[in-house]
Amino acid sequence: MQASGLILVALFSAVVSYLALLHLSSSSSSCVVVVTGESFRISGCDFTEEFIGFAKTLRVANSQP
């Protein structure tokens, strides 16, 4: 009886840990900027004043200055 209780506690702990890690990984934002020869794509970024200043400097390879 004690062994099955211990297994249940371990299983419950594993599930709670998994759900906590899943929540933490989904709540963190990851900023991705993809620049190709034809366009650029911005995904998942916080648009702060500094980031907007950076984004204004982005140029694709085929664009004219």
Curated annotation (Swiss-Prot):
Residue ranges annotated as Cytoplasmic topological domain: 25-65
Lumenal-side positions: 1-3
Transmembrane segments: 4-24
InterPro entries from the UniProt entry: TGBp3
Keywords in alphabetical order: Host endoplasmic reticulum, Host membrane, Membrane, Transmembrane, Transmembrane helix, Transport, Viral movement protein
UniProt subcellular location: Host endoplasmic reticulum membrane
GO cellular component terms, A-Z: host cell endoplasmic reticulum membrane; membrane
Keyword Transmembrane helix: yes
Keyword Transmembrane in annotation: yes
Domain of life: Viruses
Pfam family for this entry, one: TGBp3
One of the protein's GO biological processes: transport of virus in host, cell to cell
Main function: Plays a role in viral cell-to-cell propagation, by facilitating genome transport to neighboring plant cells through plasmosdesmata. May induce the formation of granular vesicles derived from the Endoplasmic reticulum, which align on actin filaments.
Additional comment: TGBp1, TGBp2 and TGBp3 seem to act together for cell-to-cell propagation. TGBp1 is the main movement protein that physically cross the plasmodesma with the viral genome. TGBp2 and TGBp3 would facilitate TGBp1 function.
UniProt similarity note: Belongs to the Tymovirales TGBp3 protein family.
Name of the protein: Movement protein TGBp3
Organism: Carnation latent virus (CLV)
